[in-house]
Structure formats: structure tokens, C-alpha cells
């Protein structure tokens, strides 16, 4: 097959991005929504191809859980049965570690249930027929107007029409914008972006609608427009008033799993540094048994953590520090007071911090990541510095996607 022709190919594997991979004389091509062993007709465009016809289906193929699958770009792998899908996702972590020469125990993938994603960031656009609200088509800016989503919590999906009403008041002409909905204990927290400057009339109308529809809050580009109820989420026993757009783990059940792994490894550590702590996802749970120093560059997240701590008794001391750990990682001397360190950086990882941590005498480390490649890089740095990687646990909190969370626990010296 030439680089711009149609033809028949056989899928050999699933790539790291969730697409089927076929090996051709002039290189690999990637075909979404296919499975290993399948024979397919495709239309090729350089190293990518569109599935035109499924000629021989894999026995591992199943009916997708959503009517929008293959149109909506949110999911890549609903068509794959659970067992091979989970083995493949675990292998993403195993492969990344092996790529750095790390041979360590990788636990079976911890599965997460459908209907548990607590935040959805919808693409939206106003049309003559109303507001389109959903997700972008695979590798496109076209918005697929959804009526269901088996990934997202029902509390959000049940409010799609209400969200469209909010979108109609936000809409900047016919241009696209984003409307995120997060499930909190106080109700849905809405955060809009890309809508341009809101005028006074829009603000009044939005305020009335948010109150009428019983949403907890609406913000625009980080500015709170109306907040009938303070959006709260508990981390352990601490209720935290989460700021607009703050980082949260994708699902509450995955967060509980990660927290349990963190706490089990820390054991009786007296003092813990929680780096890239966010709003206190782990720090506030750790504080039930250990003194915690929570470090984060997001001022709003730190302020929310601090407000949560001030309203709960019985915690060990919690100190906070605003710091850009990419530019100013904690140095070995600064790490001397701590028995343990937890770090959960963005997808880019924590290379600079890992380099300093590797030189430290900290006895226990927990590394959490949504990117196996940067996690493996950081673990290799720590391993070179004398840390022993005890175990890595992959967690499927990004269901039917090519993304996977992982928690690694490490030790150094006598335990």
C-alpha cells in the first residue's frame, strides 16, 4: 500500500496511543478502533489510516458501551474486552519501566468502574439550533453533541440540557468555548473558558440561571461569577473548599486507592513532605497520623488546603509552602527533617526534584504519576541514587483511554 492509498492490512498490536498498529514495508501505520489480529480495509494518509471496513474481527472485540463511540474522541478502546484491555494498559507501565532498565514488580492493574469520572470538560458552541455540548471528534475540532457518556458520573450527564442553557448565555457568537462541570459534595461546580468578556447583562442572567438550576458555582476564566454554595470535597476527614479549575484526581475511587497505597507505605513516618500537593489530596489524609509539609506552586490550591485544615481538629501539624518545584526543588539539606516524601507532579514529571531527592537520606518515597514515561525516568534517577523500588501499582482511572495512573513505593537504607 502506498502512503495515500486504500487497501487491506492486518493489525499486529495496539500502540501506546490506543490505536491499532500495522507493519508495512515502508513503516508502521496507526488505525483507530481496531484490535490485534483484525483484517481491515483502510484509507491511508501517511502514517495514519481511517478504518473503512472490518473484514475479520478479533474474538476480543465487544460492543462499545456508548452510542457516540468512534465519533466522540473521548474514548479509544471501548471495543476491547476487559481482560486484554487491562493487560495492555498494565503493559504501558511495564514497558516504560523496561525502557529505563527497571525490572521491578508491577502489580495487576487496579480497575475503575464506569460512570465515575467526576469532572467533564465539555467543548461547546452556539448554533442556530441551539448549543452543541460534548467532546471533539477523534483528531478534529468538530464537536459531537452527546446525550450519554458511560465514563462520567450520572450527576453530570443528567444535567446536560441545563449545561446547554448555561452555555447559551455564555456563548461568544458561534465560536467554540469550554464548559467544565465538576461533581462536588455541594453540587456541580461549573467553570467556563474561551467565552470572551462577559457583559453585565450576561452576568445577571447567568447568576439567575445558576441559582434557579441549583448549581454550586459558576466561574469564568477563574473569576467567580456566582457561588450560591461553596463547592466542598473531603480529603480524609477534612472538607476543602476547592477553587475553580483546581487539579483533582479523575475519580474518587482511584483517589481512595492511591491514598491507601500512600498511607500503607508511609506507616509511622513522623514527618512527611508532600510535593506538588495541590489542594491536599494526600497531605490531609497523611496529617491524620504524621506531621506534613505541603508544597505547591498554585496559591489558590494552597489557600484552600489551609482553610480546610483550620476547620478540623485532631490533625498533626500541617505547614504549607508556595514553591515552584520545577525551578526550585527541595534540596537534600532541606529534606533532612523528613522521614518520607510523596510527590505527584504533572505529566512532565519531577526530574529536577528527583535529582535532589536521590541525594537525600529520606527513607521512604511514594511517586505518583499519570505518565508512565516520565515516571520511569524519575524512578531511574532515584534508583541510581540508592533507592529500592518495592512495587509499582497501575490504576485505570482513565477508563477506555490510553492514559494510566501509577503509584510507585521506594525505600532507602534501613527500615
Curated annotation (Swiss-Prot):
Short name of one Pfam family: tRNA_U5-meth_tr
GO biological process, one term: rRNA base methylation
Amino acids binding [4Fe-4S] cluster: 66, 72, 75, 149
Amino-acid positions noted as binding S-adenosyl-L-methionine in the UniProt annotation, renumbered to this chain: 249, 276, 296, 344
Keywords: 4Fe-4S, Iron, Iron-sulfur, Metal-binding, Methyltransferase, S-adenosyl-L-methionine, Transferase
EC code: 2.1.1.-
Name recorded for this polypeptide: Uncharacterized RNA methyltransferase BR0438/BS1330_I0439
Gene3D superfamilies on file: 2.40.50.1070, Nucleic acid-binding proteins, Vaccinia Virus protein VP39
Single GO MF annotation: metal ion binding
Catalytic residues in the record: 370 (nucleophile)
Family statement: Belongs to the class I-like SAM-binding methyltransferase superfamily. RNA M5U methyltransferase family.
UniProt-listed InterPro entries: MeTrfase_TrmA_AS, NA-bd_OB-fold, SAM-dependent_MTases_sf, U5_MeTrfase_fam
PANTHER family according to UniProt: 23S RRNA (URACIL(1939)-C(5))-METHYLTRANSFERASE RLMD (PTHR11061:SF49), RNA M5U METHYLTRANSFERASE (PTHR11061)
